[in-house]
UniProtKB/Swiss-Prot annotation:
Its EC number is 6.1.1.7. This is Alanine--tRNA ligase. GO terms for molecular function: alanine-tRNA ligase activity; aminoacyl-tRNA deacylase activity; ATP binding; tRNA binding; zinc ion binding. Signal peptide: none annotated. Pfam families: DHHA1, tRNA-synt_2c, tRNA_SAD. The keyword Nucleotide-binding applies. The lineage of its organism: Bacteria, Bacillati, Actinomycetota, Actinomycetes, Frankiales. Zn(2+) binds at residues 566, 570, 668, 672. It catalyses: tRNA(Ala) + L-alanine + ATP = L-alanyl-tRNA(Ala) + AMP + diphosphate. It is an enzyme of class 6 (ligase). It is found in: Cytoplasm. One of its GO terms (biological process) is alanyl-tRNA aminoacylation.
Length: 880
């Protein structure tokens, strides 16, 4: 039975039993505590927590999931994978154990054809009800009771929890010993977990918490791994060999010249390549881009591990382009976004692969040096400093360094690496924390939402309105408050608001909230939970109270400026897609007053000619005074109309479409101008790379663009006057001047070197004999560049060829010293680095270097005689 059929039967089974089929949510979790969706219930979490009322009593889904906690086991076991699909059925206060258990059993036996004699069930230690239900389906000897660790589910924090029941398939004596799941979980494979959410848990350790009460409603959350079920039904040894995974595995073998099944170690690497490639494709299709933080780092790690293992298996050419094509063919029928965005998805992967291959080429040399140093010092550990340098200079993720070190038989000082990383992050982290709402305790918002309902947003049609305060929370701790006085910063929630909360790349509205006896300044607007808008305010006077009537007033000029930027972003997006192709999709944006930042997918730098064409096109569209209108329609109708959906975004059944005439049509929830003429001018400022496969354009809009162009005009006029050239001649005139200046600098450098070396012969001739070593000590005028000091020292050393020689040249103010030794002197133990350290550095300066030449600085003029005397002593002692 192929995977598509297993999936179809699952959804049909529950649809026929009154469940609404819910499409898979994006892998990008909406839950702020998660980077990625890692379980089938995650999209339903607000309903289980009571934050929102579920729109259905029963639901079923096949949810995309990524889990990296066991990444080191990927490829090594039959059941670990970083990407998987979780089939689930859910009840929100409707049915419970008496229905959930038979629902699952019927599908397994009647739908998938399992022999009931091969099935086992486990229940929680005290769950008599679940065991009684199972006894109507299975003999008592194939039902086992297990403790909290195995059969009691919680989210790890105070909240919903409950016992669970797991269904196991007995693979037979060839896979292990008898005795059921508690005896051998390799033989008895878990295929379905049924969670009965009925209690609330309190604080405590992973398994040491207390049950503090019953939930208002009893819920069902179940999960059946699609890939694991396919492994059994297709009769293969592991989930890498099922119908949607095997083609990727085979392609990896072909591209690396490795036959799967020939060598256990090679098989592990092939499975890693296949698994990580599939995971990466799914992440990119949901809008994740490679980066060094968060979910972007997860993606980068996956791609780089896949590329490295492919290289170790023998790949000599890039492999991602072809592997992604195989993933697309295998998974595209279920996930059409893989096909719709094929070019853009592959471009991201290929760009990251190209960048990483260069990283491997340059960084491996440093890594090999670090390994040699560790071994020569008798250590079995790579230093944290080396790991940090590999990360900071060459972009080596720490896990890659650890993998490579393990291959070399070494460990890594991970704690030392983390300390250096933390030190580097502190300043940026503190700055970010001070600029955002903070990590609020979201529990304060649940009673507000339950009592008052969702915040009504009216800002599409009005910029001021009367409203009522339904809640006040403390900033930082999220504590629920009843009032806030002058000077306090708090979060307030209104029953309706014209303020746009930051989202979709558009900055939040600012403004004022006025009330009887005072007013508050709105500093930020966010959505801490779905359906609630929180206004971060500073009370300027009076006292805000829950229940008070207020007038919410948006800063009109700022809103208009932000709206201009947002509409301009739509034009820029369309223009780049027209110029570069459909793969130039948006990867991110920021719309602020008078300025926009637009990130898009592209393999390389955009030519200046294309940037000029894009700028011309968007300004021409602005001048055409096209109507900008918005409307709400079904997602299906929006796609039929050709509306552009942003790469990686997920939309509901009803979507808001924004049209700019017949030029641009995009799904968007932001605010916009009424016509393109209101944009004024659009001026592209820069184009740059922000990561492999992603480019960034920054632009000014409206009066900000006009002011910039006016300043540019004044500057051009001044340059034309100064250089006595017409504006169209300025580039050639400046290039000519720069060329002549460069020639003059080269000549000056030649003359300066000639002057510095003028006394070289005399210095060599006057060398002092110290124990058979020619010692030269010399000063050069204050202000002589360090490079010239070095040049003189090396030239004098060259003139003393054939004699053991030590040459020390010092800039008269003590800013630079260079010591050079010849090979014969070094055989006597006179190494330049040691001489600098024991003379210059020992007397207060800074310095060191290699055995043949070393350099120092940060000294003063008074040190120089002492340094020369110390050098004589060192040479004499070593020559004795």
């Amino acid at each position: 039975m192929d995977t598509a059929e297993i999936r179809r039967r699952f959804l049909n089974h529950f649809s026929e039993r009154g469940h609404t089929v819910v499409p898979s949510a994006s892998l990008v979790a909406q839950d702020p505590t998660l980077l990625l969706v890692n379980a089938g219930m995650v999209p339903f979490k607000p309903y289980f927590l009571g934050d929102l009322k579920a729109p259905w009593n029963r639901a079923t889904s096949v949810q995309k999931c990524v889990r990296t906690v066991d990444i080191d086991n990927v490829g090594r076991t039959a059941r670990h994978a970083s990407f998987f699909q979780m089939c689930g059925n859910f009840s929100f206060g409707d049915y419970f154990k008496a229905e959930a258990i038979p629902f699952a059993f019927e599908l397994i036996v009647d739908g998938y054809g399992f022999n009931p004699d091969d099935l086992w069930a486990t229940v929680y230690l005290d769950d008599d009800e679940a065991e009684a239900i199972w006894r109507t389906l299975l003999p008592a000897e194939r039902i086992q009771r297990r403790g909290k660790k195995d059969n009691f589910w919680s989210m790890g924090v105070p909240g919903p929890c409950g016992p669970c029941s797991e269904i196991y398939f007995d693979r037979g004596p060839a896979y292990g010993r008898e005795g059921g799941p508690e005896a051998d979980e390799d033989r008895y494979l878990e295929i379905w977990n049924l969670v009965f959410m009925q209690f609330a848990r309190g604080e405590g350790s992973e398994y040491g918490y207390e049950i503090v009460g019953d939930l208002p409603a009893r819920n069902i959350d179940t999960g059946m791994g699609l890939e694991r079920m396919a492994t059994i039904l297709q009769g293969v040894e592991n989930l890498y060999e099922i119908d949607i995974s095997r083609p990727v595995l085979d392609a990896a073998g072909r591209l690396t010249g490795t036959r799967y099944g020939a060598d256990p170690d090679s098989d592990v690497r092939l499975r890693v390549v296949a698994d990580h490639t599939r995971t990466a494709a799914m992440l990119i299709s949901d809008g994740v881009s490679p980066s060094n933080e968060g979910r972007g780092y997860v993606l980068r790690r996956m791609l780089r591990r896949a590329v490295r293992d492919a290289r170790l298996l023998g790949a000599r050419e890039p492999v991602m382009d072809e592997l992604f094509g195989v993933v697309r063919a295998a998974m595209g029928p279920i996930y059409p976004e893989l096909v719709d965005q094929a070019e853009a998805i592959t471009a991201v992967a290929v760009a990251e692969e190209t960048a990483f291959l260069e990283t491997l080429r340059t960084g491996t040399t440093l890594f090999d040096t670090a390994v040699t140093q560790a071994r020569s010092s008798g250590s079995s550990q790579l230093s944290g400093e080396s790991a940090f340098r590999l990360h900071d200079t060459y972009g080596f993720p720490i896990d890659l360094t650890m993998d490579m070190a393990a291959d070399a038989g070494l460990t890594v000082d991970e704690a030392g690496f983390r300390r250096l990383m933390e030190r580097q992050r502190q300043a940026a982290k503190a700055d970010r924390a001070s600029r955002r709402i903070g990590n609020l305790d979201l529990s304060a918002f649940r009673p507000i939402l339950a009592a008052s309902g969702p915040t009504t947003f009216t800002g599409y049609t009005e910029l001021g309105r009367e409203s009522g305060i339904v809640g006040i929370v403390g900033i930082g701790d999220g504590d629920s408050l009843t009032a806030a006085g002058e000077g306090e910063e708090v979060g307030i929630l209104l029953d309706a608001t014209p303020f746009y909360a930051e989202s979709g790349g558009q900055e939040a509205d600012l403004g004022r909230i006025r009330f009887d006896g005072g007013e508050a300044e709105v500093l930020d607007v966010q959505r801490p939970v779905p359906d609630l808008v929180m206004h971060r305010v500073k009370v300027l006077g009076g006292e805000l109270r829950v229940g008070a009537d207020v007038f919410a007033e948006v800063d009109v000029e700022r809103r208009r400026a932000v709206s201009r930027s947002h509409t301009a972003t739509h034009l820029v997006h369309t223009a780049f897609r027209r110029a570069l192709g459909e793969s130039a999709t948006q990867a991110g944006s920021l719309n602020s007053p008078g300025r926009l930042r637009f990130d898009f997918h592209a393999l390389g730098a955009v030519p200046d000619s294309v940037l000029a064409d894009v700028e011309d096109e968007v300004n021409e569209i602005a001048l055409r005074d096209l109507e900008v209108r918005w409307y709400v329609t079904s997602q299906e109708e929006a796609r039929r109309l050709g509306a552009m959906a942003l790469f990686g975004e997920k939309y509901g059944d009803r979507v808001r479409v924004v049209d700019v005439g017949d030029y641009a049509r995009e799904l968007c929830g932001g605010t916009h101008v009424a016509s393109s003429a209101q944009l004024g001018a659009i001026k592209l400022l820069s184009e740059s790379s922000i990561s492999a496969g992603t480019r960034r354009v920054e632009a000014l809009v409206g009066m900000d663009a006009f002011r910039f162009l006016a300043r540019e005009h004044v500057l051009v006029s001044q340059l034309s006057s100064t250089l006595k050239a017409r504006p169209d001649e300025l580039a050639d005139r400046v290039a000519d001047i720069v060329g002549r200046l460069r020639d003059a600098e080269k000549e000056l450098e030649r003359l300066r070197a000639q002057a510095v070396l003028a006394g070289s012969a005399a210095l060599a001739a006057g060398a002092e004999d110290v124990g058979g070593v020619a010692l030269v000590t010399a000063q050069v005028p204050a202000g002589t560049p360090a490079d010239d000091v070095r040049l003189l020292a090396l030239d004098v050393r060259g003139r003393l060829a054939g004699r053991p020689a030590v040459v020390a040249v010092v800039e008269a103010a003590g800013a630079a010293v260079v010591v050079a030794t010849d090979e014969t002197a070094r055989t006597r133990g006179l190494r330049a680095g040691d001489l600098v350290r024991h003379s210059w550095a020992a007397l207060g300066g800074k310095g060191g270097g290699k055995p043949d030449v070393a350099q120092g600085g940060r000294g003063d003029a008074d040190m120089i005689p002492k340094v020369f005397a110390r050098l004589r002593e060192l040479v004499a002692d070593q020559s004795a």
